[in-house]
Amino acid sequence: MELNTLKPAKNSVKQNTRYGRGQGSGKGGTSTRGHKGAKSRSGYKSKPGFEGGQLPLQRRLPMYGFKNPNRVSYKPINLDTIQQLAEKAQLTVINPEVLHQHGLVSKRDKCKILGNGLLKTKLEVTAHAFSASASAAIEKLGGKANILNIYA
């Protein structure tokens, strides 16, 4: 046996049915597309949500809610991430500029500190928002949780 003589096992490779290759093949003529109509033509593509002229589901249901153009979205940062950063860079003050320098947030991100994880060191943390558990954990160790104005 050599690489140039390898073949798949007998009956392990099934041939695909070739449509539109003459009447003798059993799949010639209309090539399983039926007679006439848009679906029998080449280039036909159904539109998403089209239900054959019946009023589509997305138009039958009423409109609901809206997207608030003045919404404020925050980048969540947990206490365990802040603890790792403080240990790695020997920091006592954490603010959005420091988080940006270490690649945790982009320059325009508004950050919210969340209380997931343990904080072991006393830190002065400045952010746009804090969860109740995060600010409690920071102040429990004698640190400070300073809130920035989100519109500044």
Curated annotation (Swiss-Prot):
Compositionally biased region (Gly residues): 21-31
Keyword RNA-binding belongs to the record: yes
InterPro entries in UniProt: Ribosomal_uL15 (IPR030878), Ribosomal_uL15/eL18 (IPR021131), Ribosomal_uL15/eL18_sf (IPR036227), Ribosomal_uL15_bac-type (IPR005749), Ribosomal_uL15_CS (IPR001196)
GO biological process: translation
Stretch forming the signal peptide: none
Keyword Transmembrane among record annotations: no
Record-level GO cellular component terms: cytosolic large ribosomal subunit
NCBIfam families, A to Z: rplO_bact (TIGR01071)
Subunit structure: Part of the 50S ribosomal subunit.
Function: Binds to the 23S rRNA.
Protein name as annotated: Large ribosomal subunit protein uL15
Species whose genome carries this gene: Amoebophilus asiaticus (strain 5a2)
